[in-house]
Amino acid sequence: MPTVISDASVLIGLGAAGQIELLRGFYAQVLVPPAVWAEVTSAGTRPGAAEAHAAKNQGWLQLRAPAATPLLAHLRRTLDAGEAEALALATELPECLLLLDDADGRETALQMGLDFTGTVGVLLRAKRVGRLPAVKPVLDQLVQHHRFRVGRTLYEAVLRQAGEAL
């Protein structure tokens, strides 16, 4: 199983939906930069915080800081701190997949040639391998209760790809 580097939105979303364990089933280790950890756990009661703490205590989620490099400084000028650290760490560990939802972060990852997926990608994979019976209820929960943003076109495409009715 591969190791992944996660940005905050994936941990928050999957944690809030009670699906953070999907990451444990797919990846040997989830690496989280300090700025991402702070974002996920800062409020203490933020959706996904308790689940992230549990994953860290179980040892499959680990904190890992990127090196302080000119690249990190450059990324911090255009992205939030968590995304910048996640992308910088991904350049240090090119065998790792990046978990990332933010459009600006994904665009930068594309430009840098980094492999990534996001919350929706994890849910679709879980459905495909039988670890999640349906994507729609989880996606609806994220959109309705946890401010997960997904446009109508993408929402419909995801459900089609999952073989689920609108």
Model-identified regions with their sequence ranges:
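Active-site-proximal, substrate-binding regions of enzyme catalytic domains
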Residues: 2-97, 103, 110-114, 153-166
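Acidic, PIN/NYN-like endoribonuclease modules and their adjacent C-terminal/linker elements
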Residues: 46, 106-166
